[in-house]
Curated annotation (Swiss-Prot):
It comes from the Bacteria. Pathway: Isoprenoid biosynthesis; isopentenyl diphosphate biosynthesis via DXP pathway; isopentenyl diphosphate from 1-deoxy-D-xylulose 5-phosphate: step 2/6. The record marks 151, 205 as: Positions MEP for the nucleophilic attack. The gene is ispD. Keywords: Isoprene biosynthesis, Nucleotidyltransferase, Transferase. The lineage of its organism: Bacteria, Bacillati, Bacillota, Bacillota incertae sedis, Caldicellulosiruptorales. This is 2-C-methyl-D-erythritol 4-phosphate cytidylyltransferase. GO terms for biological process: isopentenyl diphosphate biosynthetic process, methylerythritol 4-phosphate pathway. It catalyses: 2-C-methyl-D-erythritol 4-phosphate + CTP + H(+) = 4-CDP-2-C-methyl-D-erythritol + diphosphate.
Length: 224
């Protein structure tokens, strides 16, 4: 049973700003994307890695493939994340039994998380890390609170999201014209109920410059 990691690194980072996509910015001695690549490289539960990058970054793709032995190949992504994932799934079809789809701008995954997810997906077929909501959650329309959502049932979902390959591939095939906000939604649309694995809030997505400040602090405090 083979498991591949599909690393989505094709985003341009418009909200972040700057000329270099945030996944290729340096945190100390490594690019943001490399932190998760290091984990996949060292996990005995991951057999291969495929990276999808933006157009114009061939040099970085080549560097990463040379540096990390589990990186089988890289290719260019699309202009939307869902299309990038679909392309990645097409590229690895028939090569693996399970796939872990990961956002390159979530650098702080670890080996223990990967192990938990891979062991769980063998029986659940769709699983993702998540952190329970700690703040009170309001449903708001046009700036006005409509109601309060019980936070004990609210989780903030992260990546990598791990699937039985045939399940997620079939879901993307069926709903290829629908752009859901994460991969779990595709299998949810089939009636599947994914499993959640509780995780640390350190596995956040770097979206803004403030997030990068937090990421640098984490590296300096815990990873140097």
């Amino acid at each position: 049973m083979r498991t591949f990691a599909l690393v989505c690194a094709a985003g341009s980072g418009k909200r972040f700003g700057g000329s270099t996509p945030k996944q290729f910015l340096f945190l100390e001695d490594k690019m943001v994307i490399e932190y998760s690549l290091c984990v996949f490289e060292n996990s005995p539960f991951i057999d291969g890695v495929v990276i999808l990058i933006p157009n114009g970054y061939k040099n970085i793709g080549d560097v990463l493939k040379e540096k990390y032995k589990k990186v089988l190949f890289w290719d260019y992504g699309e202009d939307e994340r869902a299309k990038t994932v679909k392309k990645g799934l097409e590229l690895i079809k028939g090569m693996c039994d399970f796939v872990a789809i990961h956002d390159a701008v979530r650098p702080f995954i670890d080996l223990e998380l990967i192990e938990k997810l891979i062991l769980e997906v063998k029986s659940s077929f769709a699983v993702a890390p998540a952190v329970s909501a700690k703040d009170t959650v309001k449903y708001v329309v046009d700036g006005y609170v409509q109601n309060t959502i019980p936070r004990e049932n609210v989780y903030l979902v992260q990546t990598p999201q791990v699937f039985k390959f045939d399940l997620i591939y079939g879901a993307y095939e069926k709903f290829e014209d629908t752009c859901f906000t994460d991969d779990l939604q595709y299998v949810e649309a089939l009636g599947v109920k994914p499993k959640i694995v509780e995780n640390s809030s350190l596995n956040f997505k770097i979206t803004t410059k403030e997030d990068m400040i937090f990421a640098k602090a984490i590296v300096e405090q815990f990873l140097k």
